[in-house]
């Protein structure tokens, strides 16, 4: 699911494999979809049986007539370290990557995040090793306290780039990529990029 650290593997495998394949991404943490949190859960065992019956028993279950990818498109929700349910809806793509795929490039500028590169002048920033303590558990199973909470504490110790408000909404299905040029005055470092939905309040 989207709360699982391996969520990027699904679109990557759908793109890279040439064998018959199906992808399923729900709102879940690293747990079986019939019992995973956050909900909604699905009949995962029944879906698996339809796949196995088709390929192992040559029973026409209709599974291969269905879209290549089914994914949960989450709605905006207030930050919390635990959710019982994630509001949203199921979406489907016949092929992956989809034919109507639209890629956008956004630039990290001094005045925020936008679609025009404004300067290549470096931005200097002293970092703190405590940034990220509230990032949640890397391998969540859906237990209380495992998900990332309010990110304002991490923002206070980070370089932040905020876009204008998306009045028409913005939906992302897939795995965003970040390309950054940087230098450091230390021999080792760690770069973390966060893509956050900012609440209006």
Task: Please name every model-derived segment.
Residues 11-12, 50:
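Active-site phosphate/pyrophosphate- and oxyanion-stabilizing loops and adjacent acidic/basic residues
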Residues 2-3, 28:
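Acidic beta-to-alpha connecting loop that harbors the catalytic carboxylate
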Residues 3-10:
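Conserved alpha/beta-hydrolase "acid-adjacent" motif
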Residues 13-17:
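Extracytoplasmic/periplasmic substrate-binding proteins
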Residues 18-32:
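Catalytic histidine neighborhood in serine/cysteine hydrolases
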Residues 39-201:
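C-terminal, loop-rich substrate-recognition/catalytic regions characterized by aromatic stacking residues
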Residues 30-41:
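Catalytic histidine-centered segment of alpha/beta-hydrolase-like enzymes
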